[in-house]
Amino acid sequence: MPQVDPELFDRGQFQAELALKASPIAAFKKAIRLAGEVLDKRFSAGSDIRPLIEARAWLVDNILQQAWNQFDWGDQSGIALVAVGGYGRGELHPHSDIDLLILLGAAEHEQYRDAIERFLTLLWDIGLEVGQSVRTVDECAEQARADLTVITNLMESRTIAGPEALRQRMLEVTSTAHMWPSKEFFLAKRAELKARHHKYNDTEYNLEPNVKGSPGGLRDIQTVLWVARRQYGTLNLHALAGEGFLLESENELLASSQDFLWKVRYALHMLAGRAEDRLLFDHQRSIATLLGYSDENPKRAIEQFMQQYYRVVMSISQLCDLIIQHFEEVILADEESGSTQPLNARFRLHDGYIEAAHPNVFKRTPFAMLEIFVLMAQHPEIKGVRADTVRLLREHRHLIDDTFRTDIRNTSLFIELFKCEIGIHRNLRRMNRYGILGRYLPEFGLIVGQMQHDLFHIYTVDAHTLNLIKHLRKLQYTPVSEKFPLASKLMGRLPKPELIYLAGLYHDIGKGRQGDHSEIGAVDAQKFCERHQLPAWDSRLIVWLVQNHLVMSTTAQRKDLSDPQVINDFALHVGDETRLDYLYVLTVADINATNPSLWNSWRASLLRQLYTETKRALRRGLENPLDREEQIRQTQSSALDILVREGTDPDDVEQLWAQLGDDYFLKHTAADVAWHTDAILQQPADGGPLVLIKETTQREFEGGTQIFIYAPDQHDFFAVTVAAMSQLNLNIHDARIITSSSQFTLDTYIVLDNDGGSIGDNPQRVKQIRDGLTEALRNPEDYPTIIQRRVPRQLKHFDFPPQVTILNDAQRPVTILEITAPDRPGLLARLGRIFLEFDLSLQNAKIATLGERVEDVFFITDADNQPLSDPQLCSRLQEAIVQQLQAGQGSDTSQTRVTF
């Protein structure tokens, strides 16, 4: 801490100002405000962070001493002002709590009571954010014995005013000789660390991490130092290196990483104007700019900053894991432990952990840096890697160079890992944490810590990739196989499972580089296959999967799966059933590894439908596609069988069906046609709109809720319907719009409730929806009000220009309107209003919400059911949509395209 800093605080000048004022409050406030401005200017100018936070602690020391001296303490030998916690370490950020202990020598302290109250009142009056306790030495001992937090705070203490002897007495009665011996303290702190990590999902890669509490945050470093203090009496990284628990290079890395997080935390406090340790979206962009990151780089400033953040916390996490394991091996060592068992000439087991047989293992036989992970996969009983061996791995990873990467021993070992029955994900994760994976595959190293600034991808690219491999492994486990029955079945019969793991490893490896990441990744995958001398068929499949890993999900979510041509085109692209099986499994794992909330019954049903229809097309032969007439005949025949069995008159059925048109039978299953037909035939002629709600857990759209509406067609039908659904808090995922020749509309919507789940068997909720829709459609002139809902906080920070594309379908008489835009409450209802204003008819729709963005496709016609052909009309439509999408947002540009 600085000895003196007149620019920050001039003691003589301050005392002179105090003497001139009747009340000291104004002088204290002025001194604190001016000093804060000086420190903030130094920070903004790029000053080193460590002197800044130490200077703030020094400033507060002086302020507290001056405040303490404002009161008559009488016999000062019995009272002391002690800094504890972070302030006790001499570290203060702009709005950190100032933790104080007013330490008393005796239980009888009535003589100090009035002065203590007035002192604390003054601190609050001058604006200091103080956390205080008043305890005797004996009370400190009693509470420290019972509370881990109290003993931890007391270990970090400094005397600010009063006799140092009191603090020394307190340290003596709370020492390891009296309480919390190092072993007990270590176990408690380790449990506390695990619980804290679990609170943050056991990942360093949260979208809005806590720089203090998240894994790899400042609290991890403090935990290491607390344990070291209890065991060795040392409380800084340099001293820890002196004890042999850190190499000097590791000490420097940990210190620089701590400095980086201190900068981020300082900036957070400064920007928020309060104590804030959450790196919220609200602040990420501003901090990136403040710390000097620029959008001129191919990556945006915010993505550069967050990648640096994630790499730093990963480094901290790795080193703290290493030190904690060292402590574990030393502090928890059993006198009778130490049994070893050789695995081979290079490795042995030590109390269940693998360790190098000698310090030169990796230097003499570099291939052992891969072999160790294969051994752990082959021996699942191994608990982990000994700390000294982890350090040896870190020290020798520089030996992994181009020569190493092409050595047949190394390439064979790497492929061998992917052929192991268990442990693939666990050991790839270890390889990543120890820095081996990114050295062996430099292209993987590029994606470590790389975050995409959106709500769709909630993990960094490397974490997502390893999660995908974890999901592939889970597909073989019974609890998961029940959730993903088809994917689990296919995973179990893939001819070479290792190929899907390798494709998964490379599927997103091209991200962060300019260009199509699927194409870039395919090039990298091809080079990998060549270097590892994989057979030609294996190589072709891996490269094809990487290149096409998005095709199935895109087709399922954006194309009309009831169109035989869509199925035939997709089948033609896939080519054979083996590729289809691999692609389906990879797609399911990819979606679940991207963001668990993305996987719902609706997406599951779309993928399953696309898989099933494509498989039928492949087995039938691509040269024999199922034509429209054949599909219609099959649907009608099956539906009629169902209806006749239920006693419905076939003549009535035929009469109704003659009015419905071909599209209806192409867009619905036979079971749904039978369900609709039965209800329509029973509907009274003047019964108003028919609204059917059916839970579809046993049907094509498993888990989604199907709403079927049959009513006289009217100009504003779609607009009224979606506005009413918006009021009912329903999320629309699919819309199938049909108008019969008798001018009745037959609309089917697949919806999920506001929380992403199906409506279920809640009769009250079903009745609420049925009544709400029926009332809205019965009285369309009372157009439902589009509720102005608050935009969620996180969505506000993902404002990007909407993309609106209008083009005519070469195969069908419709115009395709594609919209990509920031997700906002009531967006679909607003689009419905625009369709109404432009006199448009909606034939079909595909709705997809991906994090903070929507990607919707609408198939529209004009009032005469013809494709849009007027360029000026399309331009006005595009302008109206963009204006509506940008209403209340910061975007002022858009990307549009009109094609005929």
From Swiss-Prot:
SUPFAM superfamilies: ACT-like (SSF55021), HD-domain/PDEase-like (SSF109604), Nucleotidyltransferase (SSF81301), Nucleotidyltransferase substrate binding subunit/domain (SSF81593). Residues 1-342 are annotated as: Uridylyltransferase. The keyword Nucleotidyltransferase applies. Residues 461-583 form the HD domain. It comes from the Bacteria. It catalyses: [protein-PII]-L-tyrosine + UTP = [protein-PII]-uridylyl-L-tyrosine + diphosphate; [protein-PII]-uridylyl-L-tyrosine + H2O = [protein-PII]-L-tyrosine + UMP + H(+). Residues 706-784, 816-900 form the ACT domain. Its cofactor is Mg(2+). Pfam families: ACT, GlnD_UR_UTase, HD, NTP_transf_2. InterPro entries: ACT-like_dom_sf, ACT_dom, HD/PDEase_dom, HD_domain, NT_sf, PII_UdlTrfase/GS_AdlTrfase, Polymerase_NTP_transf_dom, UTase/UR. One of its GO terms (molecular function) is phosphoric diester hydrolase activity. Uridylyltransferase (UTase) activity is inhibited by glutamine, while glutamine activates uridylyl-removing (UR) activity. Residues 343-705 are annotated as: Uridylyl-removing. HAMAP family: PII_uridylyl_transf. Modifies, by uridylylation and deuridylylation, the PII regulatory proteins (GlnB and homologs), in response to the nitrogen status of the cell that GlnD senses through the glutamine level. Under low glutamine levels, catalyzes the conversion of the PII proteins and UTP to PII-UMP and PPi, while under higher glutamine levels, GlnD hydrolyzes PII-UMP to PII and UMP (deuridylylation). Thus, controls uridylylation state and activity of the PII proteins, and plays an important role in the regulation of nitrogen assimilation and metabolism. Belongs to the GlnD family. This is Bifunctional uridylyltransferase/uridylyl-removing enzyme.
